[in-house]
Amino acid sequence: MISEFIDGLLNFHFLQNALITALVIGIVGGAVGCFIILRGMSLMGDAISHAVLPGVAISFILGINFFIGAIIFGLLASTMITYIKSNPIIKSDTAIGITFSSFLALGIILIGVANSSTDLFHILFGNILAVQDMDMWITIIVSLIVLATITIFFRPLLLTSFDPILAKSMGVKVSFYHYLLMVILTLVAVTAMQSVGTILIVALLITPAATAYLYAHSLKTMILLSSGLGALASVLGLFIGYSFNIAAGSSIVLTSALLFLISFFIAPKQSGMKKTCKQ
């Protein structure tokens, strides 16, 4: 089975594209996911991943690359959510729920207008084995930009993630870094859509990060471990999907979930918690 997968990598260009794309998305998704779970923004990640659907649908209708429409609508959704929840009367989860459900409904209607149920299935659940050269290179370039941004602004992102009040008192522009993270999240959601689809993007973002959180004692270690786990889950999931002829995107997510489940019971932090409970 492994030899067949290796032979496929050597002989099939589409599988080479899929492997490279899966690795890149696993790495960048794991890195960004650390900031998402530390800020308690998992629901925001889910919202943006669904909100890109209208942009993808419009891109199909206009015959342009789906990255363009998806990024525009992802940024629009994140801006709307941030603006609505700035009202003290409206809670954060309410703003997110209203926005992402509205964008999702609009996207489904637009896909219906385009008369493309096959494309809708691929958008919702991903089709990494169909990644073209152009899509792969866009994914690589966008991911490099995201990783470079995290590296350059690591310290202020760290401060605003752990203690935004302290960061503000130190003169850090908290709102700027919030919007910066929203842009980063949107870019990653759009690139990950090819791998697992809009439905499962949030799992690819938060599961490796949550697993790394069980082991790491610093943000740098957490990011490195999360990226490694994301890459590992992506490769194993692709191998399982290709070998058994099942959805590779879903296989990637389930592999990542299995790694989390194992870590949940054996990680040092969990062992310490169990000892504390016994005492």
List each language-model region with its residue ranges.
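Loop-to-transmembrane alpha-helix initiation sites
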Residues: 18, 66-74, 93-97, 135, ...
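Helix-loop-helix "hairpin" substructures at the membrane interface of multi-pass membrane proteins
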Residues: 25, 136-208
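Short juxtamembrane and helix-loop transition motifs at transmembrane-helix boundaries
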Residues: 4-13, 27-38, 55-65, 158-166, ...
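Cytosolic-side transmembrane-helix boundaries in multi-pass membrane proteins
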Residues: 246-279
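Generic alpha-helical transmembrane segments of integral inner-membrane proteins
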Residues: 23, 27-31, 72-80, 106, ...
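Transmembrane helix-bundle core of multi-pass membrane transporters
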Residues: 2-17, 88, 96-155, 277
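Short loop segments and helix-boundary regions at transmembrane helix junctions
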Residues: 34-116, 213-224, 241-244, 267-268
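Transmembrane alpha-helical segments in multi-pass inner-membrane proteins
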Residues: 199-250
